[in-house]
Amino acid sequence: MAVRMGTAEQPACICDIGKMTDFHATRRLNWLGYGACAAAGCLWGAGFYFGKLALREMGVGHMVLYRFLFASLGMLPVLFVAGRPKGSPRWTNWTRRETGTLLLSSALGIPIQFLLQFEGLAHTTVSHAALMVGTMPVLLALGATLFAGERLDWIGWLALTGSTVGAALIVLGGGQAGIPGNVPTFAGDMLVVLSLVIALGWILMNKSLMQVHSPLAVTAYGILSGTVMLVLWVVAVNGPPPMEHVSLTAWMALAASGVLCTAATTLLWNWGIHHVPASRAGVFLNIEPALGSWLGVQLLGDKLGPFAWVGGGLILAAAVTLTARGHEADPEVLLE
């Protein structure tokens, strides 16, 4: 509906109320999207801390398995609404290609990524692992350059170089852990970085699936199918998970890491990047390394060496520089 406004002295203007309403609705979704990404970053920041608590009483495979069993419980209510478009009683059909992409994404993003990542955590400190995660925004930019045809300007390449140097300083800088017998190692740090490279494929494939299916559907089906793969692998390799002699602290840490740091964060992040440009939402990934390293220092007594502090600063500076700069909005995301 259009309304004519003006006087004889002042030219009239045509204001499309429908377009104004759409504009305000889009802006509200943008802010909600940014809020969802920020909340996901905060919850992700606690993931290594909860994981370290659980690793005191069980191995990596069983810890990751319990984490995703709890995450799957949190996703079950979502599953019943995820596959049905709004107002439709029928489930959305997935093509064979989309199903294959989902299964490959789930394999990369859950059993492969998390087993590698927490195997790395078992051989390094929470603070080191968290700071290594700070390289993720730069890896996202590099992945977009290599696989999505985007161009990385000189500032982007400078940020990539700074992030790489920062990671090297963290590895070489050493430090001490608050948990006796657990010190940062080169192998542990590199396993965390390798898991991030694998996570890049998971993120890019999820992004492509969300152009066709809802974030809820991609998240629910991805976590549940990945958990099935994880159960088969862990039980075959490590045997059944322990049930006895597990403390209440470990159970609470496992439940929190599954429901809050996995199910809730994935839902929040996937919904958030569906409504804002991923390039801008990436700045909230910086919350995870900052909060995670702080938790390691404050709650577990980790001590970072001077080179590690400098390296962490370089990583965070590179990530903020790359993600906080102005970008053109992605219309497919903003106008969905």
Label for each model-derived stretch:
Residues V3-Y66, G178-S208, V228-L232, V333-E336:
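Glycine-/small-residue-enriched transmembrane alpha-helix faces in small-molecule transporters
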Residues W31-A36, H62-A82, L104, W157-L169, ...:
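Hydrophobic alpha-helical transmembrane segments of multi-pass integral membrane proteins
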Residues G41, V64-Y66, H128-T135, L204-V228, ...:
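Helix-helix packing/entry segments at the starts of transmembrane helices
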Residues C42-F48, L76-V133, L169, S257-V276:
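Specific transmembrane alpha-helical segments of multi-pass solute transporters/efflux pumps
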Residues G45, Y49, L76, S106-P111, ...:
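Hydrophobic/small/kink-forming positions within alpha-helical transmembrane segments
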Residues Y49-E57, S88-R90, L121-A122, V171-T185, ...:
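Membrane-interface helix termini and inter-helical loops of multi-pass transporters
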Residues H62-L73, G109, F114-L160, A167, ...:
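Specific alpha-helical transmembrane segments that line the substrate/conduction pathway
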Residues M75, G143, L152-G175, L230, ...:
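Hydrophobic transmembrane alpha-helices of multi-pass small-molecule transport proteins
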